[in-house]
């Protein structure tokens, strides 16, 4: 099995009622859905909870190119590869959020391939 595509889909929804946060009152909330598709048409779904468009850019421009063609079942190896190649960006924030969304999608693929729940 090989990874053939990774899609990062920004999500946005209205909050009723608005909620308070450190940034003030929020009427909208966003996130990022991560879909990883394999050559066997297995699609894993993950979520990168914050960052929206910026996290999408990290996935599209930085992480996706290093993962296309890889075996999605080698989760630890792929995680280490992403972690090592993003070292210069630090170990917090948007990059780790992007890695997390991909990691969740890879585990979803593993569960589906094994026909087991996560």
Q: Which residues are covered by each model-predicted region?
A:
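Metal- or metallocofactor-binding catalytic centers and their adjacent structured scaffolds
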Residues: 37-113
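Structured beta-strand/loop patches that form or line metal/cofactor-binding pockets in enzymes
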Residues: 1-40, 45, 49
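Short, intrinsically disordered, charge-balanced linker/junction segments flanking boundaries
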Residues: 114-118
